[in-house]
Amino acid sequence: MKDFAAIDFETANNERSSVCSVGVVIVRNGEIVDSFYSLIQPEPNYYNYWCSQVHGLTREDTEEAPVFPKVWKQIEPLIEGLPLVAHNKPFDEGCLKAVFRVYQMDYPDYEFYDTLCVSRRVLPNLENHQLQTVAEACGYKLENHHHALADAEACAWIAREIL
Protein backbone atom coordinates (compact mmCIF):
# COMPACT_ATOMS: atom_id res chain seq x y z
CA MET A 1 0.00 0.00 0.00
CA LYS A 2 1.50 3.32 -1.08
CA ASP A 3 -1.05 5.91 0.11
CA PHE A 4 -2.71 5.80 3.53
CA ALA A 5 -3.03 7.45 6.92
CA ALA A 6 -1.85 5.51 9.97
CA ILE A 7 -3.82 6.46 13.09
CA ASP A 8 -3.52 5.69 16.78
CA PHE A 9 -5.65 6.70 19.75
CA GLU A 10 -4.99 6.57 23.47
CA THR A 11 -7.98 6.55 25.83
CA ALA A 12 -8.50 8.03 29.30
CA ASN A 13 -10.66 5.18 30.57
CA ASN A 14 -12.40 2.02 29.39
CA GLU A 15 -14.94 3.95 27.29
CA ARG A 16 -13.88 3.88 23.63
CA SER A 17 -15.14 7.47 23.28
CA SER A 18 -12.62 8.72 25.87
CA VAL A 19 -9.86 9.46 23.37
CA CYS A 20 -7.28 11.66 25.08
CA SER A 21 -4.65 11.76 22.33
CA VAL A 22 -4.38 11.01 18.64
CA GLY A 23 -1.46 10.51 16.29
CA VAL A 24 -1.77 10.45 12.51
CA VAL A 25 0.97 9.76 9.95
CA ILE A 26 0.30 10.47 6.27
CA VAL A 27 2.01 8.25 3.69
CA ARG A 28 1.93 9.06 -0.03
CA ASN A 29 3.82 7.11 -2.68
CA GLY A 30 5.30 5.02 0.11
CA GLU A 31 6.88 8.01 1.88
CA ILE A 32 5.88 9.69 5.14
CA VAL A 33 4.91 13.20 4.09
CA ASP A 34 3.06 14.61 7.11
CA SER A 35 2.07 13.89 10.68
CA PHE A 36 -0.27 15.26 13.30
CA TYR A 37 -0.52 14.90 17.07
CA SER A 38 -2.91 16.36 19.59
CA LEU A 39 -4.05 15.89 23.11
CA ILE A 40 -7.85 15.75 23.38
CA GLN A 41 -10.18 16.48 26.27
CA PRO A 42 -11.77 13.05 26.73
CA GLU A 43 -15.48 12.27 26.90
CA PRO A 44 -16.29 11.10 29.50
CA ASN A 45 -13.66 13.28 31.15
CA TYR A 46 -12.07 11.08 33.79
CA TYR A 47 -8.91 8.98 33.84
CA ASN A 48 -8.72 5.35 34.84
CA TYR A 49 -5.57 4.49 36.81
CA TRP A 50 -4.63 1.64 34.45
CA CYS A 51 -5.01 3.72 31.29
CA SER A 52 -2.81 6.44 32.78
CA GLN A 53 -0.25 3.78 33.68
CA VAL A 54 -0.13 2.71 30.02
CA HIS A 55 0.31 6.10 28.33
CA GLY A 56 1.29 8.41 31.19
CA LEU A 57 -1.45 10.98 30.53
CA THR A 58 -3.61 12.42 33.30
CA ARG A 59 -6.51 14.87 33.56
CA GLU A 60 -4.03 17.71 34.13
CA ASP A 61 -2.48 17.00 30.72
CA THR A 62 -5.76 17.40 28.86
CA GLU A 63 -7.79 19.90 30.89
CA GLU A 64 -6.88 22.70 28.44
CA ALA A 65 -6.90 20.43 25.37
CA PRO A 66 -9.46 20.88 22.59
CA VAL A 67 -12.49 18.62 22.35
CA PHE A 68 -12.56 15.94 19.65
CA PRO A 69 -14.62 17.82 17.00
CA LYS A 70 -12.06 20.65 16.93
CA VAL A 71 -9.18 18.20 16.60
CA TRP A 72 -10.94 16.20 13.89
CA LYS A 73 -11.45 19.37 11.82
CA GLN A 74 -7.65 19.57 11.61
CA ILE A 75 -7.25 15.88 10.75
CA GLU A 76 -9.99 15.61 8.10
CA PRO A 77 -8.15 17.51 5.35
CA LEU A 78 -4.97 15.49 5.97
CA ILE A 79 -6.68 12.11 5.54
CA GLU A 80 -9.12 13.04 2.78
CA GLY A 81 -9.33 10.24 0.22
CA LEU A 82 -6.94 7.97 2.13
CA PRO A 83 -7.65 4.61 3.74
CA LEU A 84 -6.88 4.46 7.46
CA VAL A 85 -4.49 1.92 8.97
CA ALA A 86 -4.18 0.92 12.62
CA HIS A 87 -2.43 -1.79 14.59
CA ASN A 88 -5.45 -3.48 16.17
CA LYS A 89 -8.18 -1.95 14.02
CA PRO A 90 -11.07 -3.00 16.30
CA PHE A 91 -9.71 -0.72 19.04
CA ASP A 92 -8.87 2.38 16.99
CA GLU A 93 -11.84 2.14 14.64
CA GLY A 94 -14.03 1.50 17.69
CA CYS A 95 -12.67 4.65 19.33
CA LEU A 96 -13.29 6.69 16.21
CA LYS A 97 -16.87 5.46 15.81
CA ALA A 98 -17.62 5.92 19.52
CA VAL A 99 -16.34 9.47 19.70
CA PHE A 100 -18.19 10.39 16.50
CA ARG A 101 -21.34 8.99 18.13
CA VAL A 102 -20.82 10.89 21.41
CA TYR A 103 -20.48 14.19 19.54
CA GLN A 104 -23.33 13.30 17.15
CA MET A 105 -21.05 13.62 14.13
CA ASP A 106 -21.78 11.77 10.89
CA TYR A 107 -19.29 8.92 10.54
CA PRO A 108 -18.08 8.74 6.91
CA ASP A 109 -17.39 4.97 6.86
CA TYR A 110 -13.64 5.20 6.51
CA GLU A 111 -11.86 2.35 4.75
CA PHE A 112 -9.78 0.77 7.55
CA TYR A 113 -6.90 -1.75 7.43
CA ASP A 114 -5.34 -3.67 10.31
CA THR A 115 -1.58 -4.25 10.49
CA LEU A 116 -2.07 -6.57 13.49
CA CYS A 117 -4.30 -8.94 11.52
CA VAL A 118 -2.03 -8.88 8.46
CA SER A 119 1.14 -9.32 10.55
CA ARG A 120 -0.24 -12.53 12.04
CA ARG A 121 -0.64 -13.89 8.52
CA VAL A 122 2.58 -12.67 6.89
CA LEU A 123 4.88 -12.89 9.94
CA PRO A 124 3.58 -16.03 11.67
CA ASN A 125 6.83 -16.91 13.44
CA LEU A 126 7.14 -13.81 15.61
CA GLU A 127 7.17 -14.31 19.38
CA ASN A 128 4.05 -12.10 19.53
CA HIS A 129 2.36 -9.54 17.29
CA GLN A 130 2.44 -6.53 19.59
CA LEU A 131 3.17 -3.23 17.89
CA GLN A 132 6.79 -2.95 19.02
CA THR A 133 7.56 -6.57 18.06
CA VAL A 134 6.11 -6.27 14.56
CA ALA A 135 7.70 -2.84 14.06
CA GLU A 136 11.11 -4.25 14.95
CA ALA A 137 10.61 -7.18 12.57
CA CYS A 138 9.91 -4.58 9.87
CA GLY A 139 13.10 -2.65 10.69
CA TYR A 140 11.65 0.07 12.94
CA LYS A 141 12.62 0.61 16.59
CA LEU A 142 9.65 1.97 18.54
CA GLU A 143 11.10 4.28 21.20
CA ASN A 144 8.03 5.79 22.89
CA HIS A 145 5.35 3.07 22.89
CA HIS A 146 1.84 4.29 23.83
CA HIS A 147 2.51 7.84 22.66
CA ALA A 148 -0.12 8.15 19.93
CA LEU A 149 2.20 9.71 17.34
CA ALA A 150 5.04 7.25 18.00
CA ASP A 151 2.60 4.35 17.68
CA ALA A 152 1.13 5.80 14.46
CA GLU A 153 4.66 6.13 13.02
CA ALA A 154 5.41 2.49 13.89
CA CYS A 155 2.12 1.44 12.31
CA ALA A 156 2.95 3.43 9.16
CA TRP A 157 6.35 1.73 8.96
CA ILE A 158 4.74 -1.70 9.32
CA ALA A 159 2.05 -0.92 6.75
CA ARG A 160 4.65 0.17 4.19
CA GLU A 161 6.36 -3.19 4.63
CA ILE A 162 3.45 -5.65 4.78
CA LEU A 163 0.30 -4.11 3.27
What do these predicted ranges mean?
Residues M1-D109, P124-H146:
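Conserved non-catalytic scaffold segment of RNase H-like nuclease domains
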Residues T11-N13, C117, A154:
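Short, glycine/acidic-enriched loop or turn micro-motifs at the edges of active sites
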Residues D106-S119:
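Conserved beta-strand -> loop -> alpha-helix junction used to position metal-binding or nucleic-acid-contacting
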Residues C117-R120, E136, W157-R160:
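Generic alpha-helical structural context detector
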Residues H147-R160:
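Acidic, divalent-metal-coordinating active-site segment for phosphoryl/phosphodiester hydrolysis
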